[in-house]
């Protein structure tokens, strides 16, 4: 075989090779969304960008308030909530008395301790320049809220073409209207048509571990950078799913312990990626089989263990609580019950 000269183009040979593979049926078609999916995809992606822009405006509003010495973020969990908006509107309109603005708080923020914290957080050097900046950021946030509400209505209208698939996805923990619409837009109502297994789909979404092995040494297994739109949505759904008592919450806690727990700062992030991978598999199977998801319960992993394994696990936990002591588990009948009869001796 002659060596190829440098600079020689191989396009013709590459095309011939591709044609041979296609003729033999060795090439599979790529995933091409339908026209209906593309419409929903345009809306869901624009909604994601609008939400990100809104978040950036909130951060700029935080910065403007902090530059004036106002520490609302240290008292309020969300400065764009009802109480936060009322106080910011009062600041923009020219109110400078801290106690008057603190009295605008609603709900639990009207408690005596919270009122004192709000008064301290609002006592600052807020000038007309800061008011102008806050007004601009507030108006942009309102525009984003209005745009997001309109997009939600349009997405719900177009995603209503797949009522059966929406009902199936709604049974998956962590899946709501936004996540289900994003799934239908990015992956489609029938993922098994394009992806023969959930593993292939996970690889396409880049929610599978990286396979980086060299000289029999396994290097970092971080996921890829693709799946820009559907991957963050599934991770967001995973954070919501682990808040509900069930198998996914139990699996998350087991994974955090396996990855090092509190000793490893990245244990929770690794575990949440694994939960997102599990959600992808569940959604794939739900749409493939047409059966809604049924949770196996928070004690799923405990039921798989024998009584001896459960006793050994409890003994190890007690040993960690009382180091240096010997832990012995004794099983006795409940009070008032007759003692167990001794086995009869053989004649």
How does the language model describe each region?
Residues 1-347:
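A detector of single, family-specific signature residues
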């Amino acid at each position: 075989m002659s060596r190829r000269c440098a600079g020689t183009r191989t396009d013709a040979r590459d095309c011939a090779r591709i044609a041979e593979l296609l003729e033999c049926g060795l090439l599979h078609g790529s995933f091409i969304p339908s026209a209906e999916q593309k419409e929903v995809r345009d809306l869901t992606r624009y909604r994601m960008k609008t939400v990100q822009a809104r978040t950036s405006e909130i951060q700029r509003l935080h910065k403007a308030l902090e530059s004036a010495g106002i520490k609302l973020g240290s008292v309020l969990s969300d400065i764009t909530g009802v109480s936060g908006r009322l106080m910011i509107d009062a600041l923009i309109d020219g109110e400078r008395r801290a106690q008057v603005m603190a009295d605008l708080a609603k709900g639990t923020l009207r408690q005596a301790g919270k009122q004192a914290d709000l008064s301290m957080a609002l006592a600052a050097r807020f000038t007309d320049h800061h008011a102008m900046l806050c007004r601009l950021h507030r108006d942009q946030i309102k525009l984003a809220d209005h745009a997001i509400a309109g997009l939600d209505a349009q997405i719900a209208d177009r995603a209503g073409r797949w009522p059966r698939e929406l009902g199936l996805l709604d049974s998956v923990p962590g899946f709501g209207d936004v996540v289900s619409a994003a799934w239908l837009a990015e992956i489609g109502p029938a993922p098994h048509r394009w992806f023969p297994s959930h593993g292939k789909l996970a690889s396409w979404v880049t929610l599978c571990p990286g396979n980086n092995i060299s000289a029999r040494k396994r290097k970092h297994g971080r996921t890829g950078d693709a799946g820009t739109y559907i991957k963050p949505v599934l991770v967001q759904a995973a954070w919501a799913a682990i808040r509900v008592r069930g198998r996914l919450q139990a699996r998350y806690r087991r994974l955090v312990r396996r990855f090092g727990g509190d000793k490893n700062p990245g244990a929770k992030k690794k575990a949440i990626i694994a939960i997102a991978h599990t959600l992808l598999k569940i959604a794939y199977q739900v749409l493939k089989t047409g059966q809604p998801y049924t949770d196996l319960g928070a004690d799923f992993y405990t039921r798989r263990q024998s009584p001896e394994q459960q006793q050994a696990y409890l003994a190890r936990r007690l040993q960690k609580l009382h180091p240096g002591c010997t832990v012995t588990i004794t099983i006795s009948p409940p009070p008032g019950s007759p003692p167990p009869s001794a086995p009869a001796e053989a004649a």
